[in-house]
Amino acid sequence: MRLPREIGPIHFVGIGGIGMSGIAEVLCNLGYTVQGSDASDNANVARLREKGITVSVGHKAENVAGADVVVVSTAIKRDNPELMTARAQRIPVVRRAEMLAELMRLKSCVAIAGTHGKTTTTSMVAALLDAGGIDPTVINGGIINAYGTNARLGAGDWMVVEADESDGTFLKLPADVAIVTNVDPEHLDHFKTFDAVQDAFRAFVENVPFYGFAVMCIDHPVVQALVGKIEDRRIITYGVNPQADVRLVDLSPANGSSRFKVVFRDRKSGATHEISDITLPMPGRHNASNATAAIAVAHELGISDEAIRKAIAGFGGVKRRFTRTGEWNGVTIIDDYGHHPVEIAAVLKAARESTSGKVIAVVQPHRYTRLQSLFEEFCTCFNDADAVIVADVYPAGEAPIEGIDRDHFVLGLRAHGHRDVLPLPQAADLAGIVKRLAKSGDLVVCLGAGNITQWAYALPNELKALG
C-alpha cells in the first residue's frame, strides 16, 4: 500500500522550512490537498501560497482542524499547540523524513548524504539526470537557481533527494542509489559521539538494496574507513585519490570556474573511460569533487558523456553557495552558507583561487554549541582569508554559553596566528569596515547559516551609499 490519493488535507507544522516546503510542494503537484503553518512569512511561504497552498502565520490549535495527517520537523517542540491538538485528536503525526520516505516509494531514488556538500551535489545530480532525459522529481535542501525553487515534480521514474542526517531520520529513506560526500563531527547534540555519526552513515549505505549502489568519496579518510567496513553492497568510490573508481584529475581553476577530467576504471577488467574537457562554472576543489560524485551516478545510469559535459557547463548553482550578491568599486560581495570549519576552509580556498586580490571573510558563527565543540577548528579554518570580521554568534534559539562569544573567538583567531581579525560591533558597521579594508579586485565573503545573508545582499548598496 502506498500513500492514498484521497488522503488529506496534509497539514505541515513549520511548512516554511527549506526541507518541509519542498515536500509540501511536490505533494501539492501530485494532487494532494496540502496546508500548513509557520511562525513567520518567508520566501518559501510566499512560493507555496502561489501554488494554492493555504499557509497560516502563527501556530494555533485551530490550524489542524480537518487534517488527516500532520507532518512535523524536528524543530517543532512537543508543546507546540498544533502538535498537541493533533495528538489529542488522534490525528496521525509523522516526521518530515517519514513523509519524504513515502514520496520516495513512488519512484527509484538517489539520496545524497554527507556532512557538507549535500545541497550542491543534489542539484548537480538533478541537472545531469535532467540533461539525460530522465526528468527527475527533486527535493533539495536549498534553492536550485535553475528552478527558482528547492523542489520540482518530474515525469520520469527517478527522484533525487537531499538526505539530512542531522536527527538520524535519514535512515528512514529508501534510497536505490546513495551518495556519501564526507563524514565529519557534526550534530553531536543528537548523536552524542562521532562514532554514532559514523554508524549512522554506515547504516544509510547498508540500507541500499542489492540491485542499487553507493557512491562514496575516499578522499575523506572517515569515508574510506567506512568503505572498508561495508560488505555485500556495491560501492563506487570517487575522488582525487589514485585508488578511486571514478577519479577527478587535472583540476585547474579558470576565472572563477573549474576545468578537469574524470577517469572511470573498472575493477574487474581494468578498462578505463575518460570524460575530458569538463568545465564547471564554480570555483573550488570541493565543488569539483561534488560534480565528480554526480558524474559517477549519471554515468552509471547511462547518461552520455556529451550530456554530462553540457549539464556541468550549464550548472546554475544553488542559492547561498558562493552566490555573488553585487559589486562596489571592483570589490565583489559573496554570500555563502558555510558555517562549519570544513566548509569555511573550502569556501575560502575557492575564494583565494578566484581572485588575485585580498579575501576578506565576514563570519557570523551559528550556534553557541557548535562554536564551543569545534572552537579549535574554527580558530584555524580562516588561513586563506587576509582579514576576518567576526560578528556576534547567531543563537538559533540557544542560550548563551559563558566564554563562547564574538570576543573570545576574535582572541582565539589571533592566538592561533591570524594577522588581521576585527570584531563587528553591529551589522550597521559592516559597510564602513569593508570600505576601509577593501580595494578593487578583492572578494568579501559573508559566511554563516543565520541572517548574515541579509547583510550580504544589503552590503553592495550600503557601500555605494558611502561613496
Swiss-Prot record:
It is an enzyme of class 6 (ligase). It catalyses: UDP-N-acetyl-alpha-D-muramate + L-alanine + ATP = UDP-N-acetyl-alpha-D-muramoyl-L-alanine + ADP + phosphate + H(+). GO terms for cellular component: cytoplasm. GO terms for molecular function: ATP binding; UDP-N-acetylmuramate-L-alanine ligase activity. It comes from the Bacteria. Pfam families: Mur_ligase, Mur_ligase_C, Mur_ligase_M. Keywords: ATP-binding, Cell cycle, Cell division, Cell shape, Cell wall biogenesis/degradation, Cytoplasm, Ligase, Nucleotide-binding, Peptidoglycan synthesis. One of its GO terms (biological process) is peptidoglycan biosynthetic process. Its EC number is 6.3.2.8. It is found in: Cytoplasm. ATP binds at G114, T115, H116, G117, K118, T119, T120. Pathway: Cell wall biogenesis; peptidoglycan biosynthesis. Cell wall formation. HAMAP family: MurC. Belongs to the MurCDEF family. This is UDP-N-acetylmuramate--L-alanine ligase. It comes from Bradyrhizobium sp. (strain BTAi1 / ATCC BAA-1182). The gene is murC.
